[in-house]
Amino acid sequence: MSDWFRHFGFAEVGDDLLMGAYPQDTDDVAALREAGVTAVFNLVQDVEYELAGGRDACATARGDAGIREERVEVVDYGNLLPGHIELAAKTVLAWLQEGERVYVHCRAGMQRSAVVSAAVVALHEGLEPLEALERVRERNPQANPLSHQRQDLLRWWAERTP
């Protein structure tokens, strides 16, 4: 397992919903597979992958393990557009309804993935978005979006709710 993945790790933040750091190598993907992950929603940009060939090696390992992936590249420390949150949340929610065990990740598993995971929990459990974020944080204390990302979560919710 990579030092990065060992340090930042991942946690289950909902029924069959996990969030955390990005896998950097085949051992990291194997750890996800051992945790029962069957689908991954990736929020990382290509420029964030530190290891040469890291993304390609992970894609191959995911494919070999039968783990599907969808991806929306979101700038680290940046804003999450309502459309990106909606796409990610709907995709993850659909997977959960299909019986998948889903892993949502950004680089360190603290900001972007926390916003998307909170959006999923809000939709799945009928919670207000900040209440959903607190639920995520109870299960993964390092989940801590930046203040503007919390505002992005609220803006997404306001734009999707009449």
Q: Which positions does each model-derived feature cover?
A:
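Non-catalytic nucleic-acid substrate-recognition regions in nucleic-acid-modifying enzymes
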Residues: M1
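Cysteine-based protein phosphatase catalytic domain of the PTP/DSP
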Residues: W4-F8, E12-R101, H124-Q151, R155, ...
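A phosphate-binding catalytic loop at a beta-strand-loop-alpha-helix junction
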Residues: G99-A118
